[in-house]
């Protein structure tokens, strides 16, 4: 073990929920299971906060609290964990949203043992994905996470849950193959076989191999993010999943795709990123505009929010492609912000369904009078999603825009085109979100709508969950350093690495021009 503190903090964070899940069958009464799951989730979240507050140096961009144990040495497989500024905020986000999803599922009566067992398994696997430093361990955690999600949708989902769950597992399992392909392509190249991310990153690959590995990983992470046209599993999964699972799907699972792109495609395959970055920028714009336009056509509340998530993830792609500190910083901030915003909106959607038993927008209406607290919370979440100043959504999107427009890696016309098209998507966002609010809460109530009066407005438990998500949204909006201080040192290092590689590529590989290289070459002084 390389951790100088001589205590495996990160292993505890990963293994605690995984092992605790197997204690659920031993609980004598079903009503105690939710308390047990909540205790495990809250303790793990509290332990994260303690470990990172006491033992993590925010000014150090390198990997910290590293642990490395030989697991299957015959194939070079190690239990290797570490944390840096990129993984730290996403680990905390995973802990917060999963713990709150346990509270959101408090009244679950159908197979609670199995539900919370799967939820804790998924929790541990998510944390493992963000902390893994061995590609095979990363792949293992990635795969462990898929099975609980499939079962949570197929057992506790809506009428078309089997279709949605099958589509999810087919898309994501097929995409996982590309993680394995890309990892093995890098591991087998050169002298010695290694799956350690640090060693793979230190290798120098032929351009063709690096481009191939980058493309494979882009497909894998593009399904999870998701990137158009690999997105079609997401609206179906959200529309059929229960609210607590939708909170995790949008709040954490999509971020695994963005994390993988930055950690591996950008961090480990920087030379290939020079060639793919313009493609990511274009795909980001497609995500933004397509997601916004598709959201307009949805009559189902959760499907509209699902397409909204696709649009918001487009900003992550643009930030990753910018080659600037602000761009990478904005991409990470957008992931954190969207995780909080999407989680609260899907949670409030679940409350709406619990009261009305429908999510069809043409059957809803006039709920503001009966549910004023829900209306206020839903309005706050929607305003955050449309990037109202003073909320985290505004800071994330603004930082991405600044990162793109201040980049000198692209020709001015290319930057202007990307920025203009992304701005069109921003204009469309308030239209479909405010229209959604109007359809749900304003106007006359549908005569056929039966409101469960005995449930009333938002209850204290539900209010607590919503506020635990909205307060960080407001806090980051007014003081972005609450989030950015956890990772800005790391994003500076990533951007510096990209700039160095970009300059080298222009000199050494002028054949294979890209918009990035063309802009840089045009800016070079001409020789006499």
Curated annotation (Swiss-Prot):
A GO CC annotation given for this chain: plasma membrane-derived thylakoid membrane
HAMAP family for the chain: NDH1_NuoM
Gene that produces this protein: ndhD1
Positions of transmembrane segments: 7-27, 32-52, 86-106, 114-134, 136-156, 168-188, 208-228, 242-262, 276-296, 310-330, 331-351, 375-395, 417-437, 463-483
Protein keywords: Membrane, NAD, NADP, Plastoquinone, Quinone, Thylakoid, Translocase, Transmembrane, Transmembrane helix
Compartments in which it is found: Cellular thylakoid membrane
Family of this protein: Belongs to the complex I subunit 4 family.
InterPro entries linked: NADH_Q_OxRdtase_chain4, NADH_Q_OxRdtase_chainM/4, NADH_UbQ_OxRdtase, ND/Mrp_TM
Record-level GO BP terms: ATP synthesis coupled electron transport; electron transport coupled proton transport
EC number(s) per entry: 7.1.1.-
Enzymatic reactions: a plastoquinone + NADH + (n+1) H(+)(in) = a plastoquinol + NAD(+) + n H(+)(out); a plastoquinone + NADPH + (n+1) H(+)(in) = a plastoquinol + NADP(+) + n H(+)(out)
Transferase is among the record's keywords: no
GO molecular function, one term: ubiquinone binding
Membrane topology listed for this record: Multi-pass membrane protein
Xref: NCBIfam families: NDH_I_M (TIGR01972), PRK12561.1 (NF009212)
Pfam families in UniProt: Proton_antipo_M
Function: NDH-1 shuttles electrons from NAD(P)H, via FMN and iron-sulfur (Fe-S) centers, to quinones in the respiratory chain. The immediate electron acceptor for the enzyme in this species is believed to be plastoquinone. Couples the redox reaction to proton translocation (for every two electrons transferred, four hydrogen ions are translocated across the cytoplasmic membrane), and thus conserves the redox energy in a proton gradient.
Principal subcellular localization: membrane
Identification of the protein by name: NAD(P)H-quinone oxidoreductase chain 4 1
Lineage: Bacteria, Bacillati, Cyanobacteriota, Cyanophyceae, Synechococcales
């Amino acid at each position: 073990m390389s951790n100088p503190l001589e205590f495996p903090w990160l292993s505890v964070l990963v293994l605690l929920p995984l092992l605790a899940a197997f204690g659920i069958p031993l609980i004598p009464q079903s009503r105690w299971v939710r308390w047990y799951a909540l205790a495990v989730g809250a303790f793990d979240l509290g332990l994260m906060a303690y470990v990172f507050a006491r033992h993590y140096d925010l000014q150090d961009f390198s990997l910290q609290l590293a642990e490395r144990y030989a697991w299957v040495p015959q194939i070079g497989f190690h239990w290797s964990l570490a944390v840096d500024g990129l993984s730290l905020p996403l680990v905390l986000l995973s802990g917060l949203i999963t713990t709150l999803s346990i509270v959101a599922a408090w009244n679950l009566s159908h197979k609670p043992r199995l539900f919370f067992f799967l939820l804790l398994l998924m929790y541990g696997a998510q944390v493992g994905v963000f902390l893994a430093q061995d590609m095979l361990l990363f792949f293992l955690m990635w795969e462990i996470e898929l099975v609980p999600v499939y079962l949570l949708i197929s057992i506790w989902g809506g009428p078309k849950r089997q279709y949605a769950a099958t589509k999810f597992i087919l898309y994501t399992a097929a995409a996982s193959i590309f993680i394995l392909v890309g990892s093995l392509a890098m591991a087998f190249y050169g002298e010695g076989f290694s799956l350690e991310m640090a060693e793979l990153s230190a290798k120098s690959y032929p351009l063709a191999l690096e481009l191939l590995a980058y493309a494979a990983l882009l497909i894998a992470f593009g399904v999870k993010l998701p990137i158009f046209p690999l997105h079609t599993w997401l609206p179906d999964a959200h529309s059929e999943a229960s609210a607590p699972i939708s909170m995790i799907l949008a709040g954490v699972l999509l971020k695994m795709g963005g994390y993988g792109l930055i950690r591996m495609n950008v961090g480990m395959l920087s030379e290939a990123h020079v060639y793919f970055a313009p493609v990511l920028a274009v795909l980001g714009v497609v995500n933004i505009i397509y997601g916004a336009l598709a959201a307009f056509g949805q009559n189902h509340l959760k499907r509209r929010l699902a397409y909204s998530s696709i649009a918001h993830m487009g900003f992550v792609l643009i930030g990753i492609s910018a080659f600037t500190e602000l761009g990478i910083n904005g991409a990470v901030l957008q992931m954190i912000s969207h995780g909080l915003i999407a989680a609260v909106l899907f949670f409030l959607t679940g409350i709406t369904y619990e009261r009305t038993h429908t999510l069809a927008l043409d059957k809803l209406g006039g709920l503001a009078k009966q549910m004023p607290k829900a209306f206020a919370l839903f309005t706050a979440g929607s305003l955050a999603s449309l990037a109202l100043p003073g909320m985290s959504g505004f800071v994330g999107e603004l930082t991405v825009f600044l990162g793109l427009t201040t980049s000198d890696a692209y020709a001015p016309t290319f930057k202007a085109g990307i920025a203009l098209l992304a701005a069109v998507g921003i204009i469309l966002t308030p239209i479909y979100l405010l229209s959604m609010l109007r359809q749900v809460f304003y106007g006359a109530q549908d005569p056929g709508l039966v409101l469960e009066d005995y449930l009333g407005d938002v209850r204290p438990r539900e209010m607590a969950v919503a506020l635990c998500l909205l307060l960080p949204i407001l806090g980051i909006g007014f003081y972005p350093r609450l989030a950015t201080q956890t990772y800005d040192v790391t994003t500076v290092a990533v951007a510096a690495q990209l700039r160095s590689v970009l300059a080298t590529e222009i000199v050494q590989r002028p054949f294979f021009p890209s918009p990035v290289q063309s802009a840089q070459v045009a800016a070079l002084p001409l020789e006499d």
